[in-house]
C-alpha cells in the first residue's frame, strides 16, 4: 500500500485534486469528512466541544453549529489549540480504522487540511500541496457564501504558505482554471504516483542518473524532507541522518540525486531498517554491502544501500556504522568540499571525466584514493569533528 499526503489551504483547490485522484483510482481518506463525522450528534467529540466552548455552539436540533464554533475557536491560538486538541486525536483514530480496512495494493490519498500543523508530513512517501494566491483563495471562498473577513481569518489561522511549501514533494499551482488543475493532477497520478506505488510494491529503485546538472538550491529542501521522512521511519535506530555528497555542496554541479547517510550502531541495526525504509519509499539495493576500502581492513567498510522508489526525486540512502571510516569520511568529504573551492573544481573535473567511462563510480576511485588522504590531512589541520 502507498499512502500519500494531500493538503492545501482553504480555497486552494485541494478538493478538486482529491476528486481527480479518486477518479484515477485512489482511495480517499478525507480529513474534512472525518472531522465532521467525529462531531456528529451523539458522539464523544461533540460532547467534548460543548464542554469546552458552551451549549451555544449547538443548533436547535442538537447538531453542531459550525459558524458559531468557528467564531469562538478561531479568535486566538489558545482557543484554536483547544479545538485541535479535541478533534485531531479523534480524526486520527478514525483515519487509521479506515486505512486498516483497505487492500494492500491500494493507493491511499490522505486528504489532511492541517498536515503541516499536525506534523504528519514525514509519515508519507509523497506529499502533494495545492497552492494558489491568497486573493484568489479569498475570492473562491466568498463565492461559496463565507464572509470575506471570516475567509481571511480562516486563512490566517492555517499554516503560512512557506511552511506548506517546505513539506511539499509536489507543489500543484492552482492559480489558473479548474481544468488546468485537473490535468496537472492526472499527469501527477499517472507519471509519478502510480510508478512510485509500483516500485514500492516491487521493492524496486528508480534508474540511476548519469548526467551532471547545474547546482540547484532546491536540493537542500528536498534533502530536508527526505531526512525527516527517514528519521520518522527509522526512529531511535538512526543515531543521526545527514545530507551528504555533491548535492550538499553549495554551488557545485552534480547528478540530480540526493545522497543521505544514516548512522547506526551496527550492520545488524542497518538490516533491521530494510523494511521500514522500503515502506517509506527507499528499497534496499541487495548486492551492495560495502564501500571501496581506503584502509587496509576491508571489514571496516561495510554498509547498506537503499535508493528512492520515487521517479520524481532520485536519492541514495547509505547506512553506515558509527565511527567507522566510511561513516566518518562521508561527513568529512562533504565539509571538505564546502570549505575548499579548489577541491570542488578538482572533483568536478574527475566527475566529468568519469562520465565518459563505462562505469562512473569505479572511474572516480583513483581520484578518491588521493582525496581520502588529503581530506583527513585537512581535518587534522582544522580540528574538524563529525
PLM features: what roles do these ranges have?
Residues 15:
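Walker A/P-loop
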Residues 1-4, 186-242:
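Helical scaffold of the NTase/Pol beta-like nucleotidyltransferase catalytic core
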Residues 319, 323-386:
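Catalytic cores of NTP-dependent nucleotidyl/adenyl transfer enzymes across multiple folds
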Amino acid at each position: 500500500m502507498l499512502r500519500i499526503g494531500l493538503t492545501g489551504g482553504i480555497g486552494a483547490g485541494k478538493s478538486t485534486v482529491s476528486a481527480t485522484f479518486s477518479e484515477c483510482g485512489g482511495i480517499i481518506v478525507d480529513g474534512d469528512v472525518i472531522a465532521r463525522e467525529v462531531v456528529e450528534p451523539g458522539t464523544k467529540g461533540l460532547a467534548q466541544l460543548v464542554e469546552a466552548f458552551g451549549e451555544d455552539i449547538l443548533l436547535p436540533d442538537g447538531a453542531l453549529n459550525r459558524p458559531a464554533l468557528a467564531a469562538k475557536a478561531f479568535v486566538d491560538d489558545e482557543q484554536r489549540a483547544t479545538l485541535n486538541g479535541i478533534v485531531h486525536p479523534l480524526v486520527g483514530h478514525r483515519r487509521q480504522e479506515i486505512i486498516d480496512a483497505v487492500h494492500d495494493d491500494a493507493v491511499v490519498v490522505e486528504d489532511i487540511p492541517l498536515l503541516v500543523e499536525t506534523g504528519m508530513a514525514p509519515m508519507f512517501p509523497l506529499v502533494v500541496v495545492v497552492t494558489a494566491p491568497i486573493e484568489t483563495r479569498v475570492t473562491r471562498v466568498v463565492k461559496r457564501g463565507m464572509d470575506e473577513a471570516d475567509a481571511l481569518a480562516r486563512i490566517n489561522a492555517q499554516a503560512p504558505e512557506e511552511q506548506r511549501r517546505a513539506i511539499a514533494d509536489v507543489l500543484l499551482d492552482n492559480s489558473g482554471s479548474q481544468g488546468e488543475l485537473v490535468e496537472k493532477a492526472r499527469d501527477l497520478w499517472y507519471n509519478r504516483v502510480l510508478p512510485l506505488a509500483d516500485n514500492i510494491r516491487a521493492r524496486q529503485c528508480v534508474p540511476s542518473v548519469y548526467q551532471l546538472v547545474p547546482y540547484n538550491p532546491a536540493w537542500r529542501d528536498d534533502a530536508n524532507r527526505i531526512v525527516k521522512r527517514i528519521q520518522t521511519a527509522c526512529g531511535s535506530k538512526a543515531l543521526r541522518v545527514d545530507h551528504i555528497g555533491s548535492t550538499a555542496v553549495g554551488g557545485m554541479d552534480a547528478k540530480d540525486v540526493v545522497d543521505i547517510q544514516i548512522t547506526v550502531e551496527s550492520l545488524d541495526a542497518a538490516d533491521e531498517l530494510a523494511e521500514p525504509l522500503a515502506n517509506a519509499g527507499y528499497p534496499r539495493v541487495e548486492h551492495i554491502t560495502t564501500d571501496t576500502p581506503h584502509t587496509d581492513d576491508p571489514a571496516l567498510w561495510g554498509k547498506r544501500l537503499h535508493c528512492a522508489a520515487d521517479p520524481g526525486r532520485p536519492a541514495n540512502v547509505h547506512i553506515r556504522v558509527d565511527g567507522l571510516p566510511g561513516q566518518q569520511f562521508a561527513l568529512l568529504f562533504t565539509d571538505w568540499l564546502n570549505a575548499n573551492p579548489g577541491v570542488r573544481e578538482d572533483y568536478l573535473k574527475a566527475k566529468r571525466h568519469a562520465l565518459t567511462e563505462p562505469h562512473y563510480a569505479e572511474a572516480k576511485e583513483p581520484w578518491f584514493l588521493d582525496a581520502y588522504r588529503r581530506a583527513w590531512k585537512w581535518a587534522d589541520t582544522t580540528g574538524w569533528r563529525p
